[in-house]
């Protein structure tokens, strides 16, 4: 819950018609959160993958899908933690920095949460996406002495935004919580600000010194099934395959996938496994657990998995680090119904 001047508050209230039914939904394999009935309180009983919470063990280990270390948590806990957002100044203006402060509260007791798990080198990931899906930020609030999280954010243009808080409270379940935000004085109407995505026809993209050839497996993606988003990376100048990617937040790549209506989200990291195996076999890792990612495999192919729950159009923002520079690729694609394949 965030504070605004009266005019901005009225705009925010109007936004809930857009967000009320869907603001808390997420992609099935990402951090869980939806408008579902609260489950009874329960203590940590298993070790869970933060990215694939449906995978659990009764002892520490690594996820067979993505290779991430499992953390102790409450599996299948569908309760949403409450996240309060305040901004200083209260009225946000495009192009001007503002201090954003987040406080997290437990669903059963409304007690403020002060302990969080570290997931990919950070305890709090924040995504800021404009409603037309043209603007994207992936940033990280810093822990404050009072248990809150804060950072300075500059919204690049006037309009509506969706803000996604991605964190895992210690002993709880991974969370991906959405907030609507609108800049002060914006007079545009909500429907005309919506994204109208067009699937990419050119799947070779260049950002900075990186050229990426993007592919999908299966092609096209199918709603309700896991698929792979693949990037084959080359140097822009000479065309040679890239093998010198640097790790970014503990992985060779990060991607956020969002549906056109901004209802469904997938937060995924580069896969470290070659074969997930089955219930009777161990996963085969592309990169041995604990190995130096950069030394073992710095490209050229980086693969992400994702499960898009519904047919429609989606946009992915995928980030790679090379030469101490962060490169962000935007990819727009279609997801078909199973019968349409």
What role is predicted for each listed range?
Residues 1-341:
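Intrinsically disordered, low-complexity terminal tails/loops enriched in metal-binding residues
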